[in-house]
Amino acid sequence: YPLYLLSNTNPLHFRYVREHFASLLKHFRALILSYRVGSRKPEAAIFQALLREVGLPPARILYIEDNEDFVAAARTHGLTAWIFVSPQYFKERLTVAGLW
């Protein structure tokens, strides 16, 4: 499955991420970053930017987030959204969904 990164960040912080985690970033098909979009989670515009970038119906997108308010916002846009609690819980959710 293609991965996308949706992040509230700024140029300074993201420069650090690029410099120190480039090997991780290469796994993402696209990066939807708040400072580039001009909108932050939980605002509608950043989720709309994600939907445009992915190009799939919202229900076909699995959004994983550790902030409950952002999960709720994603769901208002029709995304399938899970709260991230722990790696073990996430693996269990993926297994139940047939994705692991």
Give the ranges of each region predicted by the language model:
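Acidic, Mg2+-coordinating phosphoryl-transfer loop and its flanking beta/alpha structural elements
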Residues: 58-94
